[in-house]
Regions:
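C-terminal accessory/regulatory regions appended to core domains
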Residues: 1-168
């Protein structure tokens, strides 16, 4: 069963979070293991399984990155964990990595690089918003979402490197 189906929500990059939480809490009460202490072992096991599924579904759908990965996986698009990235994007990565390593020698560029990362994050958000408008996914739209997903992974890695090496 799809996590979205579990909560009776449409597949979306931006599900209604208040409705998601409400349905999660409702199912949490319904399948709480304490309610099944006097039930048969089979019913207890089923309640425990349902409770675990409920928790996992909520955890995934509550986090945008996990949700995107889940959607792509459900569409069968992450079987090949490699994505050919556009050359201009790879060049951008190289420039960011070089700029981060240069911070040790030239800390004055910290704020410029920080601003560039914020701008990049805004670009990624706009790209995600565009991808959200494409659901349900066809082959071309799915490819765009997959490209976004891998760009986001690169971005998070760059941001992590920046935070490690770039203390003002």
């Amino acid at each position: 069963m799809l996590y979205f189906d579990w909560f009776d929500l449409p597949v979306s990059l931006y599900p209604d979070t208040s409705l998601l939480k409400q349905r999660f809490l409702s199912k949490s009460k319904l399948f709480h293991p304490d309610k099944f202490t006097l039930a048969s072992e089979e019913e207890q096991a089923k309640a425990l399984e349902s409770s675990g599924f409920n928790n996992q579904a909520y955890k995934v759908l509550s986090d945008v990155d996990a949700r995107i990965q889940y959607i792509l996986d459900e569409y069968g698009l992450l079987k090949d964990d490699k994505e050919a990235m556009p050359p201009d994007f790879l060049m951008k990565m190289m420039v960011f990595n070089e700029a981060i390593s240069d911070l040790e020698d030239d800390p004055s560029s910290f704020s410029t690089l920080q601003n560039d990362l914020v701008e990049w994050e805004h670009e990624l958000k706009a790209e995600l918003d565009y991808c959200a408008s494409l659901l349900p996914l066809d082959k071309e739209n799915a490819r765009q979402l997959k490209t976004y997903f891998f760009k986001r992974k690169y971005y998070l890695r760059i941001q992590d490197n920046f935070s490690k090496f770039a203390q003002p």
